[in-house]
């Protein structure tokens, strides 16, 4: 046979063969990729360096080395003997001896009394008297550490007759536990040339510092190419039906309606003024550091293990950060995703739901309102929920296109999109629903074509499409590495089980940002829309006027997604953001379900309206709270919203009233709607869900806009984002003011010595040592939802800033006080008086001498007093006067201080200098303590006007900084400390969030979780630096710490690098849990 038909048959036979071969090759290449070899960069720490006793810093991100070998000549211990060396005790250690818990975590070879002892993780391994160690018989001390055991031996020494094994080598071994010591460097108390034979060698765990070999790279290239070819062949087979190709985008895709404009305006404005999500700083820091590290490590937890298989979305953010790290730029892809979601909902989803949805304005407005109700509070950050929400929609649309055209290529594309969505983040598991609903259509379409092309030609390209994501996940990692990382994360935690899903909903009903008005309303209204859609479908077989298949698949995807979310390892409410796209779709279905056409009963529609009111009332029974800096200035951020009456009470009353109306419709026989045109207000009442969702959306947008207005000229998220458009992209760093030297701003007393001026007029009951020895801040009880964390390093976390917990000193200060002062205040020039006493308390009054105010044009904006104790605001005040008033001892007025800090610890009371009249030239402190409770007392230092510089000027953009994960997005110009080849850069500063944020979220980064705090607490000594938020002086924005090494002279260690080829199953050693 000749002609077009013969040619077409030949093409299809060729396409069938290509589909089979290319599809199978693509699948095989994908399956083989995780097992193919990679090129590993190896790293060893060898010490001593430069031939001298010199401490070096080498903090390992994985805490321990793969293996460790130490050899020390016995004669090296001579540097620890003799009166001239009494301050030297450590021959060699992997942690600074001064650090808290150093002996619990590290290796120390040290002199204890007259013995040289090897201690690892608080366990002695081997010990020998120093006189024997220094004898000619002793040659070397050796120590080795592996995952299964550690051993130590004094080579040349034998046990004496009184020991357990006379004549045997002096040797010790510990096993049955992973005793490998934590390494943050190599430290010694000795100096001078290193003796011959001294050697420490640690193999650093760089199993994740890998790149693909040429073989693996070629396999991935071939695999992707074969997949593309297979899908092309599948398209040729699809076209065998002879039908014309349908246009890819709907005809009205690029058109614009007023509703589109409104949704777009809301998203764009929210992009600037809206609240961010809690993990934005976490993700931004990971992305910023990943380029230098060579892989996307989980920076704040899990010992530097990679984010794979969920890291590809973060890799895109890392590329995006090359342009700018400013919030408004980094979140721009999220804005595009939001717009794309709405375009897909309005142009692809709603028309597919049937004629009733397509032509219903109520459906469109409800879809838009419920979509925004989800997107605004949950998806305005860097978390993967936005791309997951979009991916779910695109997967569903591709499936529906395949069903509508009876073609397999759209289904294959749906599988690719679904797989990418699935691995874009842990919450991508919600995309399982969108993939599962493709099974039915896939079977139907395959059955229609199998008789002509066979199963292999149809399913091989589908298999290649389903596995192509493997290339992305394992492009530079091995199967063994990722399996170990995944199981290790589960062991470290948090790793909550499916039956712990109630924790997520429990948090939804807390009075916190996790259970805020916006989040609670979004989830509850989605559940309500889902319930009414299911009920109507079950009662009538379908929602009248909607397409049966698409509407059922949307409902099915949503139900499956809720079930799939049970298997996420953490249970946070921000993870509900994956439902943003589905919420819009369900909103449209629910709106159609309660129209007068579908639900003719006025009683039932009124009951639905009552349910909407009740859900809204329940949503307002919490705070209008937002995470961290997004909360600044927002109305009702720490209280239930109210105006005259509580919103929740008013809405509950309206809900009850609606139920009474429904009962009247039922009992009066007026249940059926009259058949006449509806007025506009009646049409609004028929769409209560649209009214409620838009009311909440407006409430949210107005709240955050008012927050920006209320804060101005002080810092706010909105002001910062708008400033970024003018090139001011450093966020909070330009508004946090730092007091580098608290001694420099002390005011000069008039007519009194500095040591006596503080209590010169009256100091009844106040004394230099009237301060308890421990003034640590009150502990904060465990917060709701801490079940999301694994065990933390300490059971109770306090809000005490470092150095503000008090204590005593050996030497007395200028006025005889032995109290340890905070913030670097010099006791030789700074007096202190307190009203506390041991035993029975007594009333106390303090009135200081007058202090001279500097010229206003030369003075800073703040008046500050460092204080400790528990007292009310009015009990400490500053009185001001002119020179004449001060001479007559008649103050012109007084002001009180803002108390920002954690009682009873030391903190800085502050008052804006502008609150003191410009004619005032002198001030004095007045305090009264009439409360005789032992816990009620006051301690004060003299007033000062700090010399302030911005945090950006002090910290800059070059110093390595430990940015707590909550603050990363607010400080985009500060450089997070890097890590590379398994070794962490030593940070010089730490920036923390406010007290609540620091207490609640520091456990994420602690030692037990494998975070950076487990490193810095061993290597560095923190000290708090006073800070203030410009024009928002009474705000607890967070805090700044200066990090000082325990060994200031230690140098960064030099690593010996190499390369090695590793198979996909290779593993150097078990990862060690803390």
From Swiss-Prot:
Ranges that cross the membrane: 15-37, 214-236, 251-273, 415-437, 452-474, 516-538, 573-595, 608-630, 645-667, 684-706
Subcellular location: Cell membrane
Pfam families per UniProt: Arabino_trans_C, Arabino_trans_N, Arabinose_trans
GO molecular function, one term: arabinosyltransferase activity
Cellular compartments per GO CC: plasma membrane
Major localisation: membrane
Membrane topology: Multi-pass membrane protein
InterPro entries, alphabetized: Arabino_trans_C (IPR032731), Arabino_trans_C_2 (IPR042486), Arabino_trans_central (IPR007680), Arabino_trans_N (IPR040920), EmbABC_dom1 (IPR027451)
UniProt EC number: 2.4.2.-
A Gene Ontology biological process term: cell wall organization
Keywords, comma-separated and alphabetical: Antibiotic resistance, Cell membrane, Cell wall biogenesis/degradation, Glycosyltransferase, Membrane, Transferase, Transmembrane, Transmembrane helix
Function noted in UniProt: Arabinosyl transferase responsible for the polymerization of arabinose into the arabinan of arabinogalactan.
UniProt miscellaneous comment: This is one of the targets of the anti-tuberculosis drug ethambutol [(S,S')-2,2'-(ethylenediimino)di-1-butanol; EMB]. EMB is a first-line drug used to treat tuberculosis. EMB inhibits the transfer of arabinogalactan into the cell wall.
Family per record: Belongs to the emb family.
Protein name as it appears in the record: Probable arabinosyltransferase C
Gene: embC
């Amino acid at each position: 046979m000749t002609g077009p038909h013969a040619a077409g048959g030949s093409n299809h036979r060729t396409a069938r063969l290509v589909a089979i071969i290319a599809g199978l090759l693509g699948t095989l290449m994908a399956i083989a990729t995780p097992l193919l070899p990679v090129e590993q960069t190896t790293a060893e720490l060898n010490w001593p360096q430069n031939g001298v006793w010199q401490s070096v810093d080498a903090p390992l991100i994985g805490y321990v080395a793969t293996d460790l070998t130490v050899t020390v000549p016995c004669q090296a211990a001579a540097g620890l003997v003799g009166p001239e060396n009494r301050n030297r005790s450590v021959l060699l250690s992997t942690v600074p001896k001064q650090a808290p818990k150093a002996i619990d975590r590290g290796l120390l070879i040290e002199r204890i009394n007259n013995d040289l002892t090897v201690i690892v993780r608080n366990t002695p391994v081997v010990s020998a008297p120093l006189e024997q160690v220094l004898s000619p018989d002793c040659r070397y001390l050796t120590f080795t550490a592996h995952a299964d055991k550690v051993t130590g031996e004094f080579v040349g020494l034998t046990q004496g007759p009184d020991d357990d094994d006379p004549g045997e080598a002096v040797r010790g071994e510990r096993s049955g536990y992973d005793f490998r010591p934590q390494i943050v460097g190599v430290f010694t108390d000795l100096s001078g040339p290193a003796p011959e034979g001294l050697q420490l060698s640690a193999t650093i765990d760089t199993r994740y510092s890998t790149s693909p070999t040429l073989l693996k790279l070629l396999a991935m290239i071939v695999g992707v190419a074969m997949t593309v070819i297979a899908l092309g062949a599948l398209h040729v087979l699809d076209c065998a039906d002879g039908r014309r190709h349908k246009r890819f985008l709907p005809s009205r895709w690029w058109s614009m309606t007023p509703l589109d404009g409104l949704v777009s305006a809301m998203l764009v404005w929210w992009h600037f003024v809206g609240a961010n999500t809690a993990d934005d700083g976490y993700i931004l820091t990971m992305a910023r550091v990943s380029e230098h590290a060579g892989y996307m490590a989980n920076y704040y937890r899990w010992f530097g293990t990679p984010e794979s298989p969920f890291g590809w979305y973060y890799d895109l953010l890392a590329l995006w950060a090359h342009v700018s790290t400013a919030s408004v730029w980094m979140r721009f892809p999220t804005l595009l995703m939001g717009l794309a979601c709405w375009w897909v909902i309005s142009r692809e989803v709603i028309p597919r739901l049937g004629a009733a949805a397509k032509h219903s304005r109520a459906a469109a407005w409800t879809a838009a309102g419920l979509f925004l109700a989800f997107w605004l509070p949950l998806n305005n950050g860097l978390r993967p929920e936005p791309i997951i929400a979009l991916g779910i929609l695109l997967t569903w649309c591709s499936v529906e296109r395949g069903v509508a055209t009876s073609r397999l290529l759209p289904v294959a594309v749906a599988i690719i999109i679904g797989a990418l969505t699935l691995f874009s983040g842990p919450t991508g598991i919600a995309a399982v629903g969108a993939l599962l609903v493709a099974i039915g259509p896939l079977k139907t379409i395959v059955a229609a074509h199998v008789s002509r092309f066979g199963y292999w030609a149809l399913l091989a390209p589908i298999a290649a499409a389903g596995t192509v994501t493997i290339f992305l996940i394992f492009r530079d990692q091995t199967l063994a590495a990722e399996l170990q990382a995944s199981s290790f994360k589960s062991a470290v935690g948090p790793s909550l089980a499916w039956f712990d899903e109630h924790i997520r909903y429990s948090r939804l009903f807390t009075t916190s940002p996790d259970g805020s008005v916006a989040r609670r309303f979004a989830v509850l209204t989605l559940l309500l829309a889902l319930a009414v859609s299911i009920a109507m479908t079950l009662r009538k077989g379908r929602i009248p006027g909607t397409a049966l298949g698409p509407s059922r698949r949307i409902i099915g995807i949503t139900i499956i997604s809720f079930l799939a979310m049970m298997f996420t390892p953490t249970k946070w409410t921000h993870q509900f953001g994956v439902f943003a796209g589905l919420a819009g779709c369900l909103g449209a279905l629910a709106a159609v379900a309660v129209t007068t056409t579908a639900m003719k009963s006025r009683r039932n529609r009124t009951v639905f309206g009552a349910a909407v009111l009740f859900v809204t009332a329940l949503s307002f029974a919490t705070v209008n709270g937002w995470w961290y800096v997004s909360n600044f200035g927002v109305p009702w951020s720490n209280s239930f919203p109210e105006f005259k009456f509580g919103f929740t009470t008013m809405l509950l009353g309206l809900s009850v009233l609606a139920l009474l109306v429904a009962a009247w419709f039922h009992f009066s026989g007026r249940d059926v709607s009259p058949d006449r045109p509806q007025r506009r207000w009646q049409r609004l009442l028929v769409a209560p869900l649209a009214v409620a969702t838009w009311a909440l959306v407006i409430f949210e947008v107005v709240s955050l806009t008012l927050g920006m207005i209320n804060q101005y000229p002080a810092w706010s998220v909105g002001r910062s984002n708008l400033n970024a458009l003018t090139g001011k992209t450093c966020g909070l760093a330009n508004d946090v003011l730092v007091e580098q030297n608290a001694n420099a701003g002390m005011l000069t007393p008039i007519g009194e010595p500095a040591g006596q001026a503080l209590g010169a007029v009256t100091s009844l009951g106040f004394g230099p040592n009237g301060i308890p020895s421990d003034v640590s801040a009150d502990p904060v009880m465990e917060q709701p939802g801490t079940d999301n964390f694994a065990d933390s390093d300490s059971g109770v976390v306090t809000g005490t800033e470092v150095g503000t917990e008090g204590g005593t000193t050996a030497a007395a200060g200028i006025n005889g006080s032995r109290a340890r002062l905070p913030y670097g205040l010099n006791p030789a020039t700074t007096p202190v008086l307190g009203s506390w006493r041991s035993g029975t308390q007594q009333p106390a009054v303090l009135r200081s001498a007058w202090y001279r105010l500097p010229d206003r044009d030369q003075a800073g904006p703040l008046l500050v007093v460092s204080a400790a104790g528990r007292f009310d605001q009015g009990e400490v005040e500053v009185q001001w006067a002119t020179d004449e008033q001060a001479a007559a001892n008649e103050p012109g007025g007084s002001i009180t201080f803002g108390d920002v800090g954690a009682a009873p610890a030391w903190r800085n009371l502050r008052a804006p200098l502008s609150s003191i009249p410009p004619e005032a030239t002198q001030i004095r402190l007045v305090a009264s303590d009439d409360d005789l409770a032992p816990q009620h007392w006051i301690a004060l230092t003299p007033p000062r006007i700090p010399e302030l510089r911005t945090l950006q000027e002090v910290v800059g953009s070059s110093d390595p900084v430990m940015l707590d994960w909550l603050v990363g997005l607010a400080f985009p110009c500060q450089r997070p400390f890097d890590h590379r080849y398994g070794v962490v850069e030593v940070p010089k500063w730490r920036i923390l969030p406010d007290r609540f944020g620091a207490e609640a979220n520091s456990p994420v980064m602690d030692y037990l979780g494998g975070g950076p705090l487990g490193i810095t607490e061993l290597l560095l000594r923190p000290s708090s630096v006073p800070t203030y938020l410009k024009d928002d002086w009474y705000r607890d924005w967070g805090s700044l710490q200066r990090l000082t090494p325990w060994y200031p002279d230690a140098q960064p260690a030099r690593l010996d690098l190499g390369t090695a080829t590793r198979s996909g199953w290779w593993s150097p050693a078990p990862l060690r849990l803390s």
